[in-house]
């Protein structure tokens, strides 16, 4: 008779513990198997000039920021002023990856809101995004001088995140 009540009680307590652990985690800090691994290689056309190609190999020897965005993404529009601020800081080059978008829509958005990117690569079919494990846009990566991903953030950047995490990390990575 006691076992009849004990098993559901243990299951209930286990479920509560599991849910409590999940609630204490930051939803933007999704573990990525790419952290501390070489950034996936690719070569795709640039957004502004489709005859020019971009590859992460072009950035070897530099600490840089890769921001995955799209013109149809509301959160990307929300984070846009923060990216402009990051670009103005000149802490690191900011490269855009225009993800599953229409070239003309992306160019129109950048013309209207300002272009924080040194350049944007055009990933119209989303294949590069798949290699990077993109959950959704926006996503931001910090890549070190050796081409290794050191940080991934899912969701829009904020000024607080820039000041608390990104600027200090860029400063530290530039030293090494």
Predicted regions span which residues?
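A short beta-strand-turn-helix
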Residues: 42-65
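Thiol/disulfide oxidoreductase modules built on the thioredoxin-like
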Residues: 5, 111-116, 123-174
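Hydrophobic beta-strand core positions in alpha/beta domains
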Residues: 65-67, 96, 142
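N-terminal targeting signals for export/organelle localization
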Residues: 1-45, 176
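Structural microenvironment flanking redox-active thiols in thiol-disulfide oxidoreductases
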Residues: 77-114, 124-130
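Conserved Rossmann-like nucleotide-binding pocket used by diverse enzymes
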Residues: 40-43, 69, 95, 130
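Short pre-active-site segment immediately N-terminal to redox-active cysteine/selenocysteine motifs
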Residues: 38, 62-64, 68-72, 136
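Short gly/ser/thr-rich secondary-structure transition/capping motifs
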Residues: 24-25, 45-51, 120-123
């Amino acid at each position: 008779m006691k076992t009849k009540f004990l098993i559901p009680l243990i299951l209930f307590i286990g479920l509560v513990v599991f849910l409590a652990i999940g609630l204490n985690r930051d939803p933007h800090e999704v573990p990525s198997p790419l952290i501390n691994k070489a950034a996936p290689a690719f070569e795709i056309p640039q957004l502004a000039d489709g005859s020019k190609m971009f590859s992460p190999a072009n950035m070897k020897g530099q600490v840089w920021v890769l921001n995955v965005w799209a013109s149809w993404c509301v959160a990307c529009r929300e984070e846009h002023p923060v990216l402009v601020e990051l670009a103005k800081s000149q802490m690191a080059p900011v490269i855009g990856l225009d993800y599953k978008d229409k070239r003309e829509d992306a160019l129109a958005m950048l013309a209207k809101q300002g272009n924080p990117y040194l350049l944007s690569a055009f990933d119209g079919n989303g294949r590069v995004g798949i290699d990077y494990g993109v959950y959704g846009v926006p996503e931001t990566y910090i890549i070190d001088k050796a081409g290794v991903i050191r940080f991934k953030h899912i969701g829009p950047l904020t000024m607080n995140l820039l000041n608390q995490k990104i600027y200090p990390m860029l400063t530290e990575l530039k030293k090494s």
